Amino acid sequence: TQKWTLFPYTTLFRSGTKNYVSTDDLRMAVNASVTLERPLIIKGEPGTGKTLLAIEVAKSLKMDLIEWHIKSTTKASQGLYEYDAVTRLRDSQLGDERVKDIKNYIKKGKLWEAFESDKQVVLLVDEIDKADIEFPNDLLQELDRMEFYCYETGETIKAKKRPIIIITSNNEKELPDAFLRR
């Protein structure tokens, strides 16, 4: 496992770097999350640097950052994929050849993108508390197993490399206990 080199335990940058000011507790939490390969939940008021933390972690580990910004209308399944049945129906009526391959109508979500990456990435799930209360619980299995099933194609999508997952919350509403325990 690799250490988060931006804020290692022994460094002159005890309070962060030129781009990010950090506490010892935050450095320890990030390093524990990276080492244990568990998602890190960062809570705080808007504008306190939660999103910037994910950017700095990705930079320090020299990894790509995949950002999934959550809105009040976002569904957990959108992080996996979306199937566009309406366009497929229209294309079938027009005799389009694309209709023969259902994959042409699957829009990959940010989790799918992170899972299929050939190299490890940092996945930011930004402002998870904006979604409905069931949103976090709907992702539990996928985040635990690092895989999900695509019913339309009949394939199981497994993470090639386990992403480093950073989840932010503005404390607008409480996250479910089951989600926090994992």
Tell where the protein language model's regions lie, with residue ranges.
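Short, small-residue-biased leader/transition segments that mark boundaries at the very start
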Residues: 1-12
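Dynamic helix-loop-helix/coil hinge segments at AAA+ ATPase domain boundaries and subdomain interfaces
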Residues: 10-26
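Walker A/P-loop
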Residues: 40-86
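A short helix-turn-beta junction within AAA+ P-loop NTPase domains corresponding to the substrate/partner-engaging
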Residues: 63-65, 177-182
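Short glycine-rich substrate-engagement loop in P-loop NTPases that contacts/grips substrate
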Residues: 80-118
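AAA+/SF3 P-loop NTPase mechanochemical coupling elements
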Residues: 105-106, 112-120, 150-169
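Conserved AAA+/SF3 P-loop NTPase catalytic/coupling segment centered on the Walker-B
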Residues: 109-110, 115-143, 174, 180-181
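Conserved Walker
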Residues: 128, 145-161, 173-178
